[in-house]
């Protein structure tokens, strides 16, 4: 049989590709000098496939409990409103783009800076009144105008249609982190600050079931509390609660001695009017925490920075509580108690995660969605109890024979790790390949991980 000859130029091209590929792969692998083997302390390699390694924490599409979805649909259909879809989209966009209120000290600093700039540009000194008007005009144009949201019955329904499913998905993912890593933890009491639609109670009930005997839902809005209670009763005021032991309050419990196994604040800290209010609430929530304090906010820079402020505040409160002397540590997502490397980077990024979910099946809500959120879970006890595997902070890029993982490491540095089977072993390579954004990578990490330089990062393709 006659065989076709390969053109000479094609042979030369293939040889050149091979010569380029070898050194490049070695350069990729060299980016993770300290990651050399899987941490198989729990002997999972002999019991589970790689796709089920103990660092896997991501969830498939989350779906609301059917009773909750049915109740939400019933309540919205019972009260027809004009342009519901447009109102839902407008509120969703507004809440996502919301910033924290500007503190008075920052406002004064900006005003002084603008006044100085105006005076430098003027040939003759303006009158005090004109200067004041110019500064105020510039401040209005450049400063975020924060307004407190006041929830009426109608706005509460719009909020339910906009945020019930996404909020449930984010909180359920946070609870799953605790349940997956400490399956023996069986909480009996839970408090939810800024409870809104009550999605936290539903997510907790799905996670821990009948072990929870008391849920205290705290929200300043009477309309929102009424909506949450109605959802709990299947959409009617006279129905039987789907979850027993749920109590609704407008104020936090007064007694400092009352503690709850799990305390939650989901998308509520960002609604407080000042930094002083946030500090007071966070300290109060931590005093009421017996085991875990779960904080969730939007996956934006503002949401992430707010959570890092709360994290640093609680970690700085060590040995200051006269009622509970157990120290605090970060359970998730950080594998350390050091300053956040995402905030300290030259180009700061939000440490956020993604959870896919099936939305409530309204007419405009048919496609699966993703909730982008930031979270921090603080716990009482010794940091030695925590798992210190690196956290995957971005989507994993799977390429031929190598995997890109962006890791937050136990030494407080970010690392762009490119894992190969040849350099790091088949087990670690396969664990990395089946891991996703938000998972832990089960590796024996070095005590000191050098921070990655932007110049060292290989191309993604």
Swiss-Prot record:
Gene Ontology biological-process annotations: mitochondrial small ribosomal subunit assembly; ribosomal small subunit biogenesis; translation
Positions of transmembrane segments: none
Family matches, as SUPFAM superfamilies: S-adenosyl-L-methionine-dependent methyltransferases
A GO term, aspect molecular function: mitochondrial ribosome binding
GO cellular component entries: mitochondrial matrix; mitochondrion; nucleoplasm
Family membership: Belongs to the methyltransferase superfamily. Rsm22 family.
Free-text comment on this protein's domains from its UniProt entry: [4Fe-4S] cluster-binding is essential for its ability to promote assembly of the mitochondrial ribosome (mitoribosome).
UniProt name for this protein: Ribosome assembly protein METTL17, mitochondrial
Annotated organism of origin: Mus musculus
Protein's gene: Mettl17
């Amino acid at each position: 049989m006659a065989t076709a000859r390969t053109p000479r130029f094609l042979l030369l091209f293939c040889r050149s590709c091979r010569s380029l590929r070898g050194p490049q792969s070695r350069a990729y692998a060299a980016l993770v000098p300290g990651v050399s083997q899987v941490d198989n302390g729990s002997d999972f390699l002999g019991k589970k496939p790689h796709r089920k390694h103990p660092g896997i924490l991501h969830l498939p599409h989350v779906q609301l409990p059917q009773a909750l979805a049915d109740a939400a649909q019933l309540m919205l259909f019972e009260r027809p409103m004009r342009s519901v879809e447009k109102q839902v989209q407008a509120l969703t966009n507004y809440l996502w783009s919301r910033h924290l209120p500007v503190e008075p000290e920052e406002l004064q600093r900006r005003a002084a800076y603008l006044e100085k700039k105006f005076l430098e540009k003027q040939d003759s000194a303006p009158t005090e009144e004109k200067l004041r008007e110019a500064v105020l005009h510039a401040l209005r144009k450049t400063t975020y105008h924060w307004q407190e949201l006041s929830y009426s019955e109608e706005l509460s329904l719009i909020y339910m249609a906009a945020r019930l499913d996404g909020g449930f998905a984010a909180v359920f993912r946070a609870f799953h982190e605790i349940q997956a890593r400490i399956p023996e933890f069986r909480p009996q009491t839970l408090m939810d600050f800024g409870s809104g639609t009550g999605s936290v109670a539903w997510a907790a009930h799905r996670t821990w079931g009948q072990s929870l005997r008391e849920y205290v839902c705290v929200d300043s809005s009477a309309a929102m509390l009424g909506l949450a209670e109605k959802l709990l009763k299947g959409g009617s005021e006279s129905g039987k609660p789907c979850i027993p032991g749920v109590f609704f309050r407008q104020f936090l419990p007064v007694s400092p001695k009352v503690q709850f196994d799990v305390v939650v604040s989901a998308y509520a800290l960002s609604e407080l009017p000042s930094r002083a209010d946030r500090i007071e609430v966070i300290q109060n929530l931590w005093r009421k925490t017996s085991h875990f304090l779960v904080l969730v906010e939007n996956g934006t820079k503002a949401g992430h920075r707010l959570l890092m402020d709360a994290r640093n505040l609680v970690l700085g409160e060590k040995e200051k509580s006269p009622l509970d002397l157990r120290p605090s540590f970060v359970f998730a997502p950080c594998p350390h108690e050091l300053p956040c490397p995402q905030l300290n980077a030259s180009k700061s990024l939000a440490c956020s995660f993604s959870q896919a979910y099936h939305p409530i099946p309204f007419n405009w809500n048919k496609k699966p969605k993703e909730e982008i959120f930031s979270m921090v879970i603080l716990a009482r006890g010794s940091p030695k109890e925590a798992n210190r595997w690196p956290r995957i902070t971005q989507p994993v890029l799977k390429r031929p024979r190598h995997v890109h993982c962006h890791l937050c490491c136990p030494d407080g540095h970010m690392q762009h790790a490119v894992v190969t089977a040849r350099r790091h072993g088949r087990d670690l390579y396969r664990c990395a390949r089946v891991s996703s954004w938000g998972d832990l990578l089960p590796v024996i990490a070095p005590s000191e991980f050098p921070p990655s330089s932007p110049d060292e990062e290989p191309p993604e393709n």
